[in-house]
Structure formats: C-alpha cells, structure tokens
C-alpha cells in the first residue's frame, strides 16, 4: 500500500465526520507522511486505515454526543469532603467560592456516560472519561497536534464546582490531558497536578503549597499569601501578581515570566526562551536566568540577586543591598541605582563593549574595571562578553 492509497482509504472511512473535521484529519496525515523518513515504516506504524478511522470517529462521536448536555448535583453537608481529585480529559474546570452551604457541581456538554463523581474516604473523586483511545503512536501524534478547539466540541466541555466560602480543603489534585483549571477565592492547603495542554489559574484564597506543571499552557497566580510555589510550563507564560510567598520556583521552556507587586524570601526563575520581568518585586534572594531573552526589573528591591541571560539585555532599576551578580553573554546591561557610586563596590568585566557611569565613558586597563568603594557592604559584579554597560547612580540624576 502506498501513501496515496492509505490516505484515500482513510478518507473514505471518515465519511461520517463533519466536513471540517474530515478535511483537517486528512491534512494532518498528509503532513505526517511528509515528516516521516520512511513511507513504508509510517504505514506500518499507523496500521490499517479502517482501524485508525474507527479510533478517530470514536473521538469525534464522543464530543458530538455530549453537546448541550447539562448535569448538576449537590452534596449533603453531612458528606465530609477534605480533598478533591480531578482526573480530566478535555474539560475546562472552574472552582469558585459560593454562599451555599453545600459543595455542588455542574457540567456542560459532557455526556452522562463520560462523567462520574463520588465520595471515597473524604475525597471527592471526579472523572471525565477519555474521549479518545491511545492505541497507536500516529493517533497519539494526531491528538497532540490536532486543532481541537475548532474541530470538535471538547473546548466547550465544562465542569463548575462551587465550594462554600468558609470551607478549608486539605488538598486538590488535578490531572488532565487537554483541560484547563481555574480556582478563585477557594481555601485549599495544597494544590498539585498537571495538564498536558491547558491553562492554570489561581486567584486569592488561603493556600500553603502549589506544585503544578503544564506542557503547553499559561500559568497565572494572583492575590495571595502562600508558603511555597513550584510552577513549570514547557511552552507558556507564567505570571505572578500581588503575591507574598516564602519560596517561588518558576520555569518555562519557551515563554515569559512576570512578577508584579510580588514579595518572596527566595525566588528561582528560569526561561529557556523568553523575557523575565519584575515590577515592584522584592526578594531576600533571587536568581533569574534566561537563555534568550531580556531581564527587566523596575522598582525592585533585592538583598542578594543573580541575573543571567545568554542572549539578551539586563535592565535593572531599584535597590541592591548585599550582593548582585549580573551576567550577559550577548547583550547590554543597564543598571540604575538610588545611592551614590561610593556606596557600592562594583566590579566590571567587559570583553567587548563600552562602559558608562552617569553618561561618561569609563576607561581602564584591560577588560576589568572597579568603580565605587571596596569598603562598601554592597558588592556588584557585572560581566558581558559582547555588550555595552551603562550605570546610573544618584550623582547622575
């Protein structure tokens, strides 16, 4: 069987799908063959066109079947619930505080057979049945790349959970393939989980720990005091706003990391490709790394700080108290400090690039310079391989 024969057969078996779904599916498998190194091996991996078509049709039929379906339920106050476990395939989950005395849930566009909720030993376990079958690598790849939002109704599958406002849950666990999670004004001691493709949002509420990962999706945390957070996204932005924390760890393979009006004893932020920004950010110890991107901080206050970028600029305006290490392999450094230069011990290494202090060129021997006073309690080390260095202090204002 050739590639063209395979696609023709597959197309005929998919005749029951909506035209747009059918077209998008065939286009995907055309690209699949184009990317394959060996046509025969790709066909063997996919299996028979008929079997593959059955799996794809089942995926779409489940979505069609749940359209416009609504289910709701209230749990009795006598049913004690301390934890919630959510095993989700593709639904958007919203968890809100309510004025009611009972925990309740509502679903939208999820068929009855695809949803279950029960209490087990104080745990509310909610499951959304998988809407697809992972039997072959090719079909898994299809699901990872297929435009679900425009081609089926999984984007409209929704679960709304209302929690009485005075309730304090010990833990919430969220495990999802293509679903998102938003929690607002609900008190949950520990929140943890992952989503392969979807966003994660937590706003307000009383929390101790958040540990969450998304392979492809944005993370947004706001308006809370918390002990520790560990957040990661392979491809997506991470944003903190109005936060007071003990420890923050944030990493993204490709995306920005933003801190707005945030205070934390310790911060470790890493972006493989994307900017890291801070506005009114305060930390006792902060480490900020970008592989390719700008580090930009305004109105910030650090006791100890390490700012690194492989390819990109570093811009800092604010207070540095004890120690700062600023490194840019390819990119400029712009440092704006509030005190006089003699209140800092500044050590500069610049392989290629000019150094300016308050608008004036600084000349020195070789590639190393010292500015300020060696007796200062604030030590700042600046290093660039290719990039200009600009320093502004109180005298230059």
Located regions from the model:
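Amphipathic, heptad-repeat alpha-helical segments
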Residues: 2-19
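A composition-biased, non-transmembrane "mature-region" signal
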Residues: 12, 47-50, 134, 155
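Residue-level detector of well-ordered alpha-helical segments, enriched
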Residues: 21-25, 52
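Short linear S-[DN]-x-LW-Φ motif typified by the pepsin-like aspartic protease active-site region
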Residues: 23, 64-129, 135, 149-194, ...
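Amphipathic alpha-helical segments that form the core helices of the histone-fold
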Residues: 25-40
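Short, charged early-sequence alpha-helical segments and their helix-coil boundaries
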Residues: 37-68
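Short, surface-exposed interaction patches in beta-rich subdomains
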Residues: 129, 151-153, 157-158, 162-167, ...
């Amino acid at each position: 069987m050739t590639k063209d024969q395979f696609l023709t057969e597959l197309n005929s078996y998919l005749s029951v799908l909506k035209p747009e779904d059918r077209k998008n599916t065939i286009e995907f498998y055309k690209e699949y063959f184009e990317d394959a190194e060996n046509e025969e091996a790709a066909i063997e991996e996919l299996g028979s066109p008929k079997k593959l078509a059955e799996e794809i049709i089942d995926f779409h039929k489940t979505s069609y079947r749940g359209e416009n379906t609504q289910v709701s339920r209230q749990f009795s106050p006598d049913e004690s619930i301390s934890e919630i476990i959510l095993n989700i395939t593709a639904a958007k989950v919203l968890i809100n505080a309510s004025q009611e005395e009972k925990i309740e849930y509502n679903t939208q566009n999820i068929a009855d057979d695809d949803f279950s909720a029960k209490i087990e030993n104080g745990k509310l376990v909610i499951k959304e049945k998988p809407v697809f079958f992972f039997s072959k690598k090719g079909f898994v790849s299809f699901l990872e790349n297929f435009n679900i939002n425009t081609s089926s109704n999984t984007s409209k599958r929704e679960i709304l959970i209302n929690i009485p406002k005075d309730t304090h849950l010990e833990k919430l666990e969220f495990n999802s393939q293509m679903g998102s999670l938003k929690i607002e004004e609900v008190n949950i001691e520990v929140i943890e989980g992952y989503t392969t493709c979807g966003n994660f949002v937590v706003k307000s509420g009383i929390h101790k720990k958040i540990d969450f990962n998304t392979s492809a999706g944005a993370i947004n945390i706001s308006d809370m005091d918390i002990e520790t957070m560990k957040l990661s996204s392979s491809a997506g932005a991470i944003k903190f706003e109005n936060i007071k924390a003990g420890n923050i760890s944030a990493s993204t393979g490709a995306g920005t990391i933003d801190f707005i009006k945030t205070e934390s004893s310790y911060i470790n932020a890493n972006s493989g490709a994307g900017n890291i920004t801070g506005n009114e950010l305060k930390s006792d110890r902060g480490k900020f790394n970008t592989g390719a991107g700008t580090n930009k901080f305004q109105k910030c206050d650090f006791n100890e700080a390490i700012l690194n970028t492989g390819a990109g600029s570093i811009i800092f305006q604010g207070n540095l108290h004890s120690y700062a290490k600023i490194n840019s392999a390819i990119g400029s450094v712009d440092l704006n400090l509030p005190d006089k230069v003699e209140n800092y011990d500044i050590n500069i290494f610049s392989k290629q690039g000019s150094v300016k202090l308050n608008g004036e060129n600084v000349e020195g021997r070789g590639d190393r310079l010292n500015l300020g006073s060696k007796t200062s309690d604030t030590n700042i080390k600046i290093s660039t391989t290719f990039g200009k260095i600009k320093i502004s202090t109180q005298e230059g204002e």
